[in-house]
A protein has these predicted regions:
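Minor-groove-contacting beta-hairpin "wing" of winged helix-turn-helix DNA-binding domains
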Residues: 60-69
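A short, conserved structural fragment
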Residues: 49-59
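Short helix-coil junctions and helix-kink-helix linkers
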Residues: 26-38
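Short amphipathic alpha-helical interaction segments
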Residues: 35-50
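Short acidic, hydrophobic short linear motifs in intrinsically disordered regions
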Residues: 17-28
């Protein structure tokens, strides 16, 4: 059993009304002999999400991680958590591309692709 298995098993029993924090997950992993920091817990969750595991989160007080139970759960998370980050990063990239083009007086577009 790996640390990610412990994390996933703990999250699978959680809902949006009863999420588990990364601190609790790190403590749980330690109880099984895995010395994971909260940052490493977040990384394990990020990797599981990339594998298609529908782990959701809420950042509010008392927040934490939980499993998606429906398409509505997933879409709410996607639209309030993921999408704003993607849009912000895309906006930042466009502004930096424009600034680089001005700064270096060249067509940045040609060099970016």
């Amino acid at each position: 059993m790996e640390a990610k298995d412990i994390i996933l098993k703990a999250i699978q029993h959680r809902t949006s009304e009863n999420p588990i924090s990364n601190v609790e997950l790190a403590q749980l992993c330690r109880s099984y002999g895995f010395n994971l920091s909260t940052e490493r817990v977040r990384e394990e969750i990020r990797l599981m999400r990339k594998d298609g595991v529908l782990i959701l989160s809420q950042a509010s007080a008392g927040g934490g991680y939980y499993m998606s139970r429906s398409m509505d759960d997933y879409l709410r998370f996607r639209n309030t958590n993921l999408l704003p980050r993607v849009i912000d990063m895309q906006d930042t990239m466009k502004l930096m591309d424009y600034a680089a083009k001005r700064e270096y007086k060249m067509d940045a577009q040609a060099r970016l692709f």
